[in-house]
């Protein structure tokens, strides 16, 4: 690929300060080195995979069920896009808060399925995530389909056509 765009130029265009900082840190001098990353993958990932395998077997589970996010969605009004969120009474990084529940399964290679579960009193969506055993994708899809057949229909989202970025 002969792209003339640099990683620094891409990072400069990220509008959310928290996400911009996260990407900048990944490419800074303090970033995890390839050797450190490889060591973590080789040493720690198999341990985490085994912990998940044990949890499924010891508890005779077909799936682990968690909220997709630890807090409900928030309004994407332009005025609050870059603010932090409150989690357990404390200010927390928006991106990390909203991705923390869904990261674990993907990091260990487990199939996961996030499905809209309902709406808050304010009409904002909440989701539920089903995490399956390794190589049990079809079983997980069946579980998701069964859940969807029991869940009441949800209204279509209202689309906010306001720009999310201010230049």
Put a short name on every predicted segment.
Residues 41-42, 90-91, 133:
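A generic secondary-structure micro-motif detector
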Residues 94, 101, 106-167:
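Structural helix-boundary/capping segments
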Residues 50-55, 100-102:
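Generic recognition of flexible, low-complexity loop/linker segments
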Residues 1-53, 67-71, 76, 116-117, ...:
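Short helix-loop capping/hinge segments that flank enzyme active sites or metal/cofactor-binding pockets
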């Amino acid at each position: 690929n002969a792209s003339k765009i640099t990683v620094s130029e891409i990072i400069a265009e990220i509008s959310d300060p928290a996400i911009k900082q996260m990407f900048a840190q990944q490419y800074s001098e303090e970033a995890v080195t390839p050797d450190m990353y490889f060591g973590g993958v080789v040493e720690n990932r198999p341990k985490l995979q085994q912990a998940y395998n044990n949890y499924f077997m010891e508890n005779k589970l077909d799936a682990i069920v968690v909220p997709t996010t630890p807090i409900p969605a928030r309004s994407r009004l332009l005025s609050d896009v870059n603010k932090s969120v409150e989690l357990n009474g404390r200010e927390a990084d928006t991106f990390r808060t909203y991705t923390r529940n869904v990261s674990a399964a993907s990091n260990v290679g487990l199939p996961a399925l996030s499905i809209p579960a309902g709406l808050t009193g304010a009409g904002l969506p909440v989701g539920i995530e089903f995490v399956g055993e390794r190589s049990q994708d079809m079983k997980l899809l069946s579980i998701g389909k069964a859940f969807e057949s029991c869940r009441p229909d949800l209204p279509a989202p209202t689309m906010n056509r306001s720009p999310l970025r201010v230049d």
